[in-house]
């Protein structure tokens, strides 16, 4: 489920924001929801399909570091890299963009109608966002929670040895 529009109730994946990376210049940006598979890079204007990758060879620092993370020994297993403050995720989308997108997609005209819509669907939105973040930003079941990442770096100094059990259900 996704808070983007009412089809989230049917289980469709309609994310309000999608992180894209241009395969030509490696410019990363966030785009709004679109059914289109073709994208145009805002930096170099290159047109590409979502998920395309170009290997620029060993001279490209981004291409050569795709399979290793500077601060994450489990990057090859699909774990997200960790930020300097211990978080493994962030969101740079504007709240205004999200609000306007939700209003447009749900055909909401008045502020009062939007307030009622949020009150009636708030739990669904929070759960959908949490599921989306965990689905796209976690790795092994033992370490797939933000508390686990936090504990790893604050209590175990980033050392994976003897750190088999993380409680992600608190």
Swiss-Prot record:
Q: Name one GO cellular component term.
A: virion component
Q: Where can this protein be found?
A: Virion
> Which keywords label this protein?
Virion
Protein name stated in the entry: Uncharacterized protein L485
| Originating species | Acanthamoeba polyphaga mimivirus
């Amino acid at each position: 489920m996704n808070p983007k529009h009412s089809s989230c109730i049917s289980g469709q994946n309609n994310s309000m924001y999608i992180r894209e990376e241009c395969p030509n210049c490696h410019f990363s940006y966030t785009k709004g929801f679109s059914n289109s598979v073709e994208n145009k890079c805002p930096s170099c204007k290159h047109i590409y399909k979502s998920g395309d990758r170009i290997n620029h060879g060993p001279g490209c620092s981004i291409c050569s570091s795709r399979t290793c993370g500077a601060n994450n020994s489990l990057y090859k297993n699909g774990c997200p890299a960790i930020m300097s403050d211990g978080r493994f995720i962030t969101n740079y989308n504007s709240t205004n963009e999200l609000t306007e997108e939700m209003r447009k997609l749900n055909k909401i005209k008045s502020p009062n109608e939007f307030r009622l819509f949020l009150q009636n669907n708030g739990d669904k939105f929070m759960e959908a966002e949490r599921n989306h973040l965990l689905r796209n930003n976690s790795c092994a079941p033992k370490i797939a929670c933000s508390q686990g990442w936090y504990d790893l770096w604050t209590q175990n100094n980033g050392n994976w040895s003897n750190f088999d059990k993380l409680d992600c259900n608190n």
